[in-house]
Amino acid sequence: MIVSGISLVLEGGGMRGMFSAGVFEAFMQKELIFPHIVGVSAGACNIVSYMSQQPLRTRRVIQNYVGDKRYCSLSNWLRTRSLFGFDFILKELPQNLLPFDYEAFRKYPGQLYVGTTDVITG
């Protein structure tokens, strides 16, 4: 069911995403579709599992991989100057460990907007 007149805005905040993951699982159970969705940081990462209609996917990422050194670690920082292992997060996870349904994501009838900030220029 398309929920007209309501947009979703998802904040960042790392582990706060676990709450959002549960909310999106409920939205999927009720088959709710929102026409406009805005995500920032972790909120943007979490929303894609909802848009691809993959219940439990975000929860599994958080429960099974956030503590993995490939996901976040000092060794990542020393190697790439980022705590996050983006190759692991954006390639290994969605392509192999927890496959992402790109086709279902593309078919989502609503629009996704993602807020970003350049770390140098703001």
Task: Describe every region a protein language model picked out.
Residues M1-V40, V48-G122:
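Patatin-like phospholipase
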